[in-house]
Amino acid sequence: MKHLLISIVGMLSIYTSNAQQVIDVHCHNIFPEFTEFLERHGAAMKETFPLPQWDIDTHLEFMENAGIGKAILSMSAPQPYYGNTDECTRIVRFYNEASARLKSDYPGKVLFCASLPLPDVEAAIKEAVYALDT
């Protein structure tokens, strides 16, 4: 009985340690197309706060080395509204669809927070519905 109890406790501790994982909840995926968009608007902040180059392979390697099991990606600042709602909506849709492809390509490793084309509330509602339905 004593050995059974020790075995059960040992198995539970292994299960518990395997069930836990580190989740990076503050992670920005910066697609080259987003950086180009910001550059067109003079908003890339190259001299003061340049956005890093980002790619999924390098990020997955970083996650592995850091012991991160899952990343929740989100769009970086600055937000992409520069007076043109249609343009903002297009880049946000691009970001959401590209992020959804990453989620699909790397199941269990990558999730993302959909972005919304603010400050246009109507466009934001449409994008939220689209993001939730796809």
Q: Can you name each region flagged by the protein language model?
A:
Residues 10, 18-134:
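Helix-coil boundary/capping segments in enzymes
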